[in-house]
């Protein structure tokens, strides 16, 4: 416990809380260019090949974004939109790539939760 004199000499400093999505810089989304599209494996106890992309954002940040849904058309130099939201079983993946926006196509044959995957309404 500090004395009054110690507190006068150097007052208490409020700790700043760590941001969960620093690369967005308070924006809801950011645009970027894919520098590498690849698959990676999740933490234990899960097993899969998760599709991810390394993205260079317009503000200079380089982040890893998860590509949701079945199948995708992304490759190097694809222009994508990114949103916040981590993937719990992929360490270091703190962003999601938006489907159906810019160069990313929506998921084919998607009937439910279509808006989340950029799928058009079936006829």
From Swiss-Prot:
PROSITE patterns (alphabetical): RIBOSOMAL_S12
Family matches, as Pfam families? Ribosom_S12_S23 (PF00164)
Q: SUPFAM superfamilies, from UniProt?
A: Nucleic acid-binding proteins
Q: Which CDD domains match?
A: Ribosomal_S12
Gene Ontology biological process terms, A to Z: translation
Molecular function via GO: rRNA binding; structural constituent of ribosome; tRNA binding
Modification after translation, per record:
Both N-terminus methionine truncation and retention have been observed for this protein.
Cellular component annotations (GO), alphabetically ordered: small ribosomal subunit
Q: InterPro entries recorded for this chain?
A: NA-bd_OB-fold, Ribosomal_uS12, Ribosomal_uS12_bac
Give the record's keywords alphabetically. Methylation, Ribonucleoprotein, Ribosomal protein, RNA-binding, rRNA-binding, tRNA-binding
* Positions bearing 3-methylthioaspartic acid: 89
Q: Which family does it belong to?
A: Belongs to the universal ribosomal protein uS12 family.
What task does this protein carry out?
With S4 and S5 plays an important role in translational accuracy. Interacts with and stabilizes bases of the 16S rRNA that are involved in tRNA selection in the A site and with the mRNA backbone. Located at the interface of the 30S and 50S subunits, it traverses the body of the 30S subunit contacting proteins on the other side and probably holding the rRNA structure together. The combined cluster of proteins S8, S12 and S17 appears to hold together the shoulder and platform of the 30S subunit.
Identify the HAMAP family for this entry: Ribosomal_uS12_B (MF_00403_B)
Subunit and partners: Part of the 30S ribosomal subunit. Contacts proteins S8 and S17. May interact with IF1 in the 30S initiation complex.
Per its record, how is this protein called by name? Small ribosomal subunit protein uS12
The species this protein was found in: Rhodopseudomonas palustris (strain ATCC BAA-98 / CGA009)
Q: What broad taxonomic lineage does this protein's source fall under?
A: Bacteria, Pseudomonadati, Pseudomonadota, Alphaproteobacteria, Hyphomicrobiales
Q: Which gene encodes it?
A: rpsL
């Amino acid at each position: 416990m500090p004395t009054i004199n110690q507190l006068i000499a150097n007052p208490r400093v409020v700790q700043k809380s760590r941001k969960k999505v620093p690369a967005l810089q308070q924006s809801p989304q950011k645009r970027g260019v894919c520098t590498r599209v690849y698959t990676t494996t999740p933490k234990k106890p899960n097993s899969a090949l998760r599709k991810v992309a390394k993205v260079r954002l317009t503000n200079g940040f380089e982040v890893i974004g998860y590509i949701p849904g079945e199948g995708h058309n992304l490759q190097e130099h694809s222009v994508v939109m990114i949103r916040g939201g981590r993937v719990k079983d992929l360490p270091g993946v703190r962003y999601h790539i938006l489907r159906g926006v810019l160069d990313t196509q929506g998921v084919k044959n998607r009937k439910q939760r279509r808006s989340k995957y950029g799928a058009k309404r079936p006829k």
